[in-house]
């Protein structure tokens, strides 16, 4: 016996010691004890047509696996190349590349956050991709940020996506 609550009401539920068959449960509910004792109870189980069909079918598995092609196999050019740096993603699964405006809006910057590893290598690769001088890309080592002169978010995101970040 255990207690059950349903919408704040408490009630005791008695579970039978042995599981009852459907017929025995029906008899105990709708017939008196004397009438139930006079009728023989059977424990034969009934099967549905679906269960009979499943029992008749053989249970062998095919010997050859089915091979499906879901797309082109990755080639050497599409595999991401291992780099000495990593740019993590924000909690929204977007790349952490942001536009900044300083000095009253006169100085436009693009900031890359969550840079891990060799920031100088990322600085060189990014400057080469953007066609900038290396001095126009700055590494902020304590914070793990890179700053690029100008608003270049779309180009930087394209570069980072191309690397597989």
Swiss-Prot record:
GO CC list: mitochondrial large ribosomal subunit
Keywords: Mitochondrion, Ribonucleoprotein, Ribosomal protein
A molecular function GO annotation: structural constituent of ribosome
InterPro entries attached to this UniProt entry: Ribosomal_mL49
Region feature (Disordered): 42-81
Subcellular location: Mitochondrion
Listed GO biological process terms: translation
Compositional bias annotation for Low complexity: 42-75
Record family assignment: Belongs to the mitochondrion-specific ribosomal protein mL49 family.
Subunit structure: Component of the mitochondrial large ribosomal subunit (mt-LSU). Mature N.crassa 74S mitochondrial ribosomes consist of a small (37S) and a large (54S) subunit. The 37S small subunit contains a 16S ribosomal RNA (16S mt-rRNA) and 32 different proteins. The 54S large subunit contains a 23S rRNA (23S mt-rRNA) and 42 different proteins.
Job description of the protein: Component of the mitochondrial ribosome (mitoribosome), a dedicated translation machinery responsible for the synthesis of mitochondrial genome-encoded proteins, including at least some of the essential transmembrane subunits of the mitochondrial respiratory chain. The mitoribosomes are attached to the mitochondrial inner membrane and translation products are cotranslationally integrated into the membrane.
Entry protein name: Large ribosomal subunit protein mL49
Species, as recorded: Neurospora crassa (strain ATCC 24698 / 74-OR23-1A / CBS 708.71 / DSM 1257 / FGSC 987)
Gene label: img2
């Amino acid at each position: 016996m255990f207690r059950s609550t349903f919408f704040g009401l408490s009630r005791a539920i008695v579970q039978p010691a042995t599981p009852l068959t459907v017929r025995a449960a029906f008899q105990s509910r709708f017939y008196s004890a004397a009438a139930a004792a006079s009728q023989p109870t059977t424990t034969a189980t009934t099967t549905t047509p679906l269960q009979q069909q499943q029992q008749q079918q053989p249970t062998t598995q095919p010997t050859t696996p089915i091979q499906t092609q879901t797309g082109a196999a990755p080639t050497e050019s599409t595999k991401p190349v291992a780099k000495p740096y990593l740019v993590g993603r924000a909690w929204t699964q977007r790349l952490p590349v942001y536009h900044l405006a300083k000095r009253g809006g006169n100085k436009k910057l693009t900031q890359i956050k969550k840079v891990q590893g060799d920031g100088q290598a990322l600085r060189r690769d990014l400057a080469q991709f953007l066609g900038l001088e290396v001095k126009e890309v700055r590494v902020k080592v304590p914070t793990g940020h890179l700053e690029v002169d100008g608003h270049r978010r779309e180009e930087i995101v394209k570069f980072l996506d191309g690397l597989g970040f």
